[in-house]
Amino acid sequence: METLELQGAKLRYHQVGQGPVLIFIPGANGTGDIFLPLAEQLKDHFTVVAVDRRDYGESELTEPLPDSASNPDSDYRVKRDAQDIAELAKSLSDEPVYILGSSSGSIVAMHVLKDYPEVVKKIAFHEPPINTFLPDSTYWKDKNDDIVHQILTEGLEKGMKTFGETLNIAPIDAKMMSQPADTEEGRIEQYKRTMFWLEFEIRQYTHSNITLDDFTKYSDKITLLNGTDSRGSFPQDVNFYINKETGIPIVDIPGGHLGYIQKPEGFADVLLNMWG
């Protein structure tokens, strides 16, 4: 893996291929390896960069997180993630780059576009679970609070079951999300990663400060992506709302919420039709 030294962290990332830079931002998984099957499909057309977000995978903190980062209203980590992606983009290319964020990674991508539009050539938001600008934002914020409380009081299994039901996660995705790692070490790491996401992301990222105006001023750069196998899920409803209010196009893409690993060939074909 490649390394970029930043304030407070060593950011590590996979890089394959040739051509214009395309950065993938992972969601709750946090690590770029989940995009490697997709990168193989695109490496003849793009320099594909799949990043381990700060404090996930091989990336490491060189300074501790501030105590305030676990506050449900803190925007520290999502803003820091966005700054990391912008600094990575500038280190890799003198030109604006392509960016795709998936799930909470798409929320990071929104903040990249909002705060660092100069690094963005084109950007895609794949099934973003953000609620800030929705008419029923308070309802969804309370639901995330309830999920966190249930996990902390009744255990991870029950809480994640509620999470899947609340967001209407498709069966193809629920099966993958609940699949345990192959080794005991892997299962421990999986648990730690999930609990980190619970403490620092599920509430903070989904209710971070993004408005519809943040999209409209850059609408020519944005594509919304919804999976063909995850219809009816909450993240798709978010994209439908953005589309209704702004006119930014939605493109159907193969697979579900994890379509890039479920159907990488078809996922790549859509990206090449968009940007190739």
From Swiss-Prot:
Disordered, as annotated region: 57-76
One of the record's GO molecular function terms: hydrolase activity
Domain AB hydrolase-1 per the UniProt entry, residue ranges: 20-137
A Pfam family it matches: Abhydrolase_1
SUPFAM superfamilies hit by this protein: alpha/beta-Hydrolases
Keyword annotations: Hydrolase
GO CC annotation terms, alphabetical: membrane
Assigned EC number: 3.-.-.-
EC class: hydrolase
InterPro entries: AB_hydrolase_1 (IPR000073), AB_hydrolase_fold (IPR029058), AB_hydrolase_sf (IPR050266)
Protein family (similarity comment): Belongs to the AB hydrolase superfamily.
Protein's name in the database: Uncharacterized hydrolase SAUSA300_2518
UniProt organism field: Staphylococcus aureus (strain USA300)
